[in-house]
């Protein structure tokens, strides 16, 4: 087993958003690490091309011989990599906007007699009746629950709130 495969997901995570040189199957690959698969140790490298496009390369974890960090990167590269695969309608919210959205949704759900609280460990996550959570930016797609009926009803309420507030 090679050195790369002996590492674990937490160690692989240290390479994320950094420029690396990877040797795999006696070939050398260079690029920015977008992610590493925690099961297979596969590496996804991104290279920004001069024409403004990018190339994405997947390297199989079992073939990796060495990985060397060549550049730690900076905040702008990290932001660019983080937003590569976000849809165009995805927008960033300021902390103030998120707080307004959270409070507005919380009032709306209370008005509709839905028991809503803020989770103790994360003041950003809303919790409905202890069985559903709503994460920022507090849209229907940000709801999580194993109870499909409650999930569907709360998502419908949130959608109605968004439509009413536009």
Curated annotation (Swiss-Prot):
<feature type="modified residue" description="Phosphoserine">
    <location>
        <position position="165"/>
    </location>
</feature>
<keyword id="KW-0597">Phosphoprotein</keyword>
<dbReference type="InterPro" id="IPR047575">
    <property type="entry name" value="Sm"/>
</dbReference>
<comment type="function">
    <text>The SMN complex catalyzes the assembly of small nuclear ribonucleoproteins (snRNPs), the building blocks of the spliceosome, and thereby plays an important role in the splicing of cellular pre-mRNAs. Most spliceosomal snRNPs contain a common set of Sm proteins SNRPB, SNRPD1, SNRPD2, SNRPD3, SNRPE, SNRPF and SNRPG that assemble in a heptameric protein ring on the Sm site of the small nuclear RNA to form the core snRNP (Sm core).</text>
</comment>
<dbReference type="GO" id="GO:0005829">
    <property type="term" value="C:cytosol"/>
</dbReference>
<dbReference type="GO" id="GO:0000387">
    <property type="term" value="P:spliceosomal snRNP assembly"/>
</dbReference>
<feature type="domain" description="AD">
    <location>
        <begin position="68"/>
        <end position="166"/>
    </location>
</feature>
<dbReference type="GO" id="GO:0003723">
    <property type="term" value="F:RNA binding"/>
</dbReference>
<protein>
    <recommendedName>
        <fullName>Gem-associated protein 6</fullName>
    </recommendedName>
</protein>
<keyword id="KW-0539">Nucleus</keyword>
<dbReference type="Pfam" id="PF06372">
    <property type="entry name" value="Gemin6"/>
</dbReference>
<keyword id="KW-0508">mRNA splicing</keyword>
<feature type="domain" description="Sm">
    <location>
        <begin position="4"/>
        <end position="73"/>
    </location>
</feature>
<dbReference type="InterPro" id="IPR046857">
    <property type="entry name" value="Gemin6_Sm-like_dom"/>
</dbReference>
<dbReference type="Pfam" id="PF20417">
    <property type="entry name" value="Gemin6_C"/>
</dbReference>
<dbReference type="GO" id="GO:0097504">
    <property type="term" value="C:Gemini of Cajal bodies"/>
</dbReference>
<keyword id="KW-0507">mRNA processing</keyword>
<feature type="modified residue" description="Phosphoserine">
    <location>
        <position position="94"/>
    </location>
</feature>
<dbReference type="GO" id="GO:0000245">
    <property type="term" value="P:spliceosomal complex assembly"/>
</dbReference>
<dbReference type="GO" id="GO:0034719">
    <property type="term" value="C:SMN-Sm protein complex"/>
</dbReference>
<keyword id="KW-0963">Cytoplasm</keyword>
<dbReference type="InterPro" id="IPR046856">
    <property type="entry name" value="Gemin6_C"/>
</dbReference>
<dbReference type="InterPro" id="IPR009422">
    <property type="entry name" value="Gemin6"/>
</dbReference>
<dbReference type="GO" id="GO:0032797">
    <property type="term" value="C:SMN complex"/>
</dbReference>
<comment type="subunit">
    <text>Part of the core SMN complex that contains SMN1, GEMIN2/SIP1, DDX20/GEMIN3, GEMIN4, GEMIN5, GEMIN6, GEMIN7, GEMIN8 and STRAP/UNRIP. Part of the SMN-Sm complex that contains SMN1, GEMIN2/SIP1, DDX20/GEMIN3, GEMIN4, GEMIN5, GEMIN6, GEMIN7, GEMIN8, STRAP/UNRIP and the Sm proteins SNRPB, SNRPD1, SNRPD2, SNRPD3, SNRPE, SNRPF and SNRPG. Interacts with GEMIN7; the interaction is direct. Interacts with GEMIN8; the interaction is direct. Interacts with SNRPB, SNRPD2, SNRPD3 and SNRPE; the interaction is direct.</text>
</comment>
<dbReference type="InterPro" id="IPR047574">
    <property type="entry name" value="AD"/>
</dbReference>
């Amino acid at each position: 087993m090679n050195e790369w495969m002996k590492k674990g997901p937490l160690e692989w995570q240290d390479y994320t958003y950094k420029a690396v040189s990877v040797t795999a199957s006696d070939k050398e690959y260079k690029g920015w690490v977008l992610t590493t698969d925690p099961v297979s140790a596969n590496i996804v490298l991104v290279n920004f091309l001069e024409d403004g496009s990018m190339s994405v390369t997947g390297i199989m974890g079992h073939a990796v011989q060495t990985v060397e960090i060549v550049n730690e990167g900076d905040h702008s590269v990290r932001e660019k990599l983080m937003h590569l695969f976000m849809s165009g309608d995805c927008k960033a919210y300021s902390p103030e906007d998120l707080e307004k959205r959270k409070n507005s949704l919380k009032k709306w759900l209370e008005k509709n007699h839905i028991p809503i609280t803020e989770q103790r460990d994360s003041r950003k996550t809303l919790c409905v009746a202890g069985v559903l959570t709503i994460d920022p930016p507090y849209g229907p797609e940000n709801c999580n629950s194993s109870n499909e009926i409650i999930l569907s009803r709360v998502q419908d309420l949130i959608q109605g709130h968004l439509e009413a507030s536009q």
